[in-house]
Structure formats: structure tokens, C-alpha cells
Amino acid sequence: TPLLYALSRASNSSIPQLVAVSEYLLAHRARLTGMEKEQVKRIGTDFEWFRDRMSSETVAELEPALMELYEMFGVEPVAKRKMYDGHSDIKVTKSSWQEQFDQLWDLLVPSCGAASTVQGEAVRVCGRLAHELLDNGGINWDDDFQTMAESLTSYLVQGEPLDESERAEAGKIIAGITRAGLIRGGEDALARLTELTVRWVLKNPGPLALKETSYMR
């Protein structure tokens, strides 16, 4: 439908215009498919993910329109993204490593570029590797991705390192990532690497400043 199409194509900058279009279409009895709420949630999620990249003026312009959109479609507002302040201890409240990873990602990983801390960058690297190796099948894999993967080895020995057996396990998994964009052990190996990374971050709650990286990804 025209309404669903407009919602699915919306970006942050077009939210005010989207509100006007939605109001017009709904006033003229636009047919609802049941998928509109999902798109509004997507729009809100994208807005919060990029909140840290927007100026305060841009947020002040777009956020009220986003709130109108939530109300218009009866959608619970997406929680505001709270970014790490750069100096407090890094903490999580969840119990499973998967949920802890998600919390660390939301807290420490910026919407674009490298993180400010080694902990955040280790989490970011795991996320990037999972997306490229599992979701994309390694189609974009190049020397820069390889360097990024190998850098994780150096991150996990900083501060309070993993114990010797865990360091060896992480190193073996990283060494099993080939220059063809494949990982020995597949999804299970990458999940274990991510679990070990989360464990290392939780052993190092104090922020470790990240130096300039040797990769651009």
C-alpha cells in the first residue's frame, strides 16, 4: 500500500515529512496491512542507533515528529539509546552472554567507526565478523577485514586477560578465519569467540582507551 511503502522507505531525515504523509493517507482511509507498526519500530530503532551522530539541533527537530509517529500508529516508543560516558565502569544487567553482548553493543559501539575503548572495539569486531562471515557469507572479505579479525587477539590480552586456556581457544578460533572469508567451525566457533570476548570485557570494567586501529572497517 502507499502508506506501507512510505513507512518502509523512510529515513531519519524524512520523519517530519513522513508524519504529514501518514496523516494525509490515514485521513483518506488508507488500508492498513498490520505491518505498519513494525516499520514504525524500525524507524525508531534507526533513529536511536544514530542518535549519537546527530547534533542537538537535529534531534530537537526530528524527535517530536517521531513521537507523533509513535502515537499515530499506537507504537511504544523505542528506548532512548544511552551511550557510554567514557569513564564509568562498564556494567551489564543481563545474565546470558548473548544478552550481555547485546547490552555491551548498545552501550559501547558507536553508530559509525571504531569505539573509544578497547572493550567496545572488541565487541564491535565480533559483531562485524558475525555479520560478514555469517550473514554475508564473506563476500566482502578483504585484507582489512582480516586485519580486524587478527586485532582481536591483541585486544583480549590487554588489562586483565582471559586465562591461558581461554586465550589459546580464542587464538585458535581467530587463526581459523581464512583469507577467503571462511571460519573453521562456522557459527559455533564464532559464537564461542563472542562469548569469550564478553567474558574478557566483564573482567575489565574499567575503560581501556583504544589507540588508532590499523584497519578502516
Predicted feature residues:
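Non-catalytic, alpha-helical, charged scaffold/linker segments
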Residues: 57-99
